[in-house]
Structures are given as structure tokens and as C-alpha cells.
Amino acid sequence: RQMCIRDRALPLQETLHHILNACDHEGISVDCDAVIDCTVLADRELLQRVLNNLVDNSRKYGANALSFGSVCEEDTVTLWMEDNGPGVPEEQLPCLFEPFYRGDAARTKPGAGSGLGLAVVKKSMQQMGGNVRAENAPGGGLRIVMQLPMAKEG
């Protein structure tokens, strides 16, 4: 069944507020100090689902602290989320968003999931005209980098 995508102007900080509440409830500390409040063009429900999926994924693999940041450039908003989990071996990073792919940590951890969560994230980002990639964070952990169109003023 095809989902109806309703792209609209969404303030980034308002969108992250929902995630902050969910993380607080789960006992995950979140730092959003590096988030610049710009407005993305995205489907509210789909973007919330993407962010929830990413937070869930980090929590599953041992993260208990997240930080978000953003940069607004011309017509694109780049939002990233870093966790304090174990990170991912460099050679596995390109495969993380493939359906049913499960890295070393997922294969050895009971109840770690089916390998579909990040594939859904990638598809959802593409449906909203954006993209997503993973890299290891400089201080350890995983950094997920998302790009979405910036909403035009007026």
C-alpha cells in the first residue's frame, strides 16, 4: 500500500521536541545544543518515524546518550544524530541501510531486530526528497547524517 506523503514546512526544533520527550521517558540523555532552528520540507509523521527508529536503534545497541546538531545551507538542511554506543566497523557502514543487513553487533545480540529498521529510514528519507548515511563519530559511537530540503520562506 502506497503511503501518502504530505511535505510541509516543519521547524526542526519543534520536530525534535517530540523525540526529547520520548528519550527522557526512556532514560536517554539528549543534547540538542548544536541544533540550529531552520525549517525543513518533510512529512511530519514520516520524519517522526525516522527519528524514533534511529533513537530506538541506538538504544538497542547500548547507547544511553544522544546528541543532535544541524547545519542549514542554501536549500538543504543537514541534521545529524550521534550516540555513545560502540560504533560500527568501518567496512560495515555502507551496508547498514540495506534491507535485512545485520552487522556484527546485531548478529550477536539477542533481540536486536530484523535488519529492516535502517532500510525503512533510508526509504522514508528518499520519499521526502532527502538522504541518509552513517559514519563513526569522532569520539566513538555512531553518527547518522540526514539531509532534507529546506522549506522556502513565504
Positions of the model-derived regions?
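Short conserved segment of the HATPase_c
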Residues: V88-Y101
